[in-house]
UniProtKB/Swiss-Prot annotation:
Protein name stated in the entry: Octanoyltransferase
GO cellular component, one term: cytoplasm
Boundaries of every BPL/LPL catalytic domain copy: 29-204
Enzymatic reactions: octanoyl-[ACP] + L-lysyl-[protein] = N(6)-octanoyl-L-lysyl-[protein] + holo-[ACP] + H(+)
Chain positions recorded as substrate binding sites: 68-75, 135-137, 148-150
GO biological process: protein modification process
Pathway(s) annotated for this protein in UniProt: Protein modification; protein lipoylation via endogenous pathway; protein N(6)-(lipoyl)lysine from octanoyl-[acyl-carrier-protein]: step 1/2
HAMAP family: LipB (MF_00013)
InterPro entries from the UniProt entry: aa-tRNA-synth_II/BPL/LPL, BPL_LPL_catalytic, Octanoyltransferase, Octanoyltransferase_CS
The keyword Metal-binding belongs to this UniProt entry's keyword annotation: no
Organism listed in the record: Dechloromonas aromatica (strain RCB)
Disulfide pattern: none
Major location (coarse): cytoplasm
NCBIfam families listed in its UniProt record: lipB, PRK14342.1, PRK14343.1
Amino acid sequence: MPPVVKRLGRVDYQPTFQAMQDFTASRTAETPDEIWIVEHPPVYTLGQAGKPEHILRDVGIPLVKIDRGGQVTYHGPGQVVIYLLLDLSRLKIKVRELVTAIEQSVIDLLAEYGITAERRDGAPGVYVGEAKIAALGLRIRNGCSYHGVSLNVDMDLSPFAAINPCGYAGLKVIQTKDFNIPLTAHEAGEQLSQHLLQQLDQKNG
């Protein structure tokens, strides 16, 4: 059974994070997988490996410490975030395979618009040249994933300048708008979720 796709619109980060934890903690072997498509109001999230020194200055944006892997990143309007609540044991997918599938979904989406993107060893996410266009972070609990991937579409990128994105000082961050791709965050979410479903179907095939 393919995951149930839920379009939650623009929602605050903290209750969404709590809902992911609650869903994962309460799911059973029969619980259908879900994919949530969201946007968030401005928020920084600090992963388990996050170091306070990667937050360079206070710009009045709230910071939430969370349990995904990785360092600090920014979410805001005009960026699509897709959360993958998957039973990896049931799907027979390893964590590394899921990361690769997520990255490939973004790469395939951008390729449809003539953009050549790539992954990097040891630095999860998707890059165009030297700049990062998508970030990902996951948590696995009892063989089930939550958290997911964010793709910069048409947003104010300036809050990234107040952090070392994903722990990398001076990392340039870009968005699809920079390539004159006529996408809204909503449209990008719809298209990216379809690529994710295709990748998961291939992995599970």
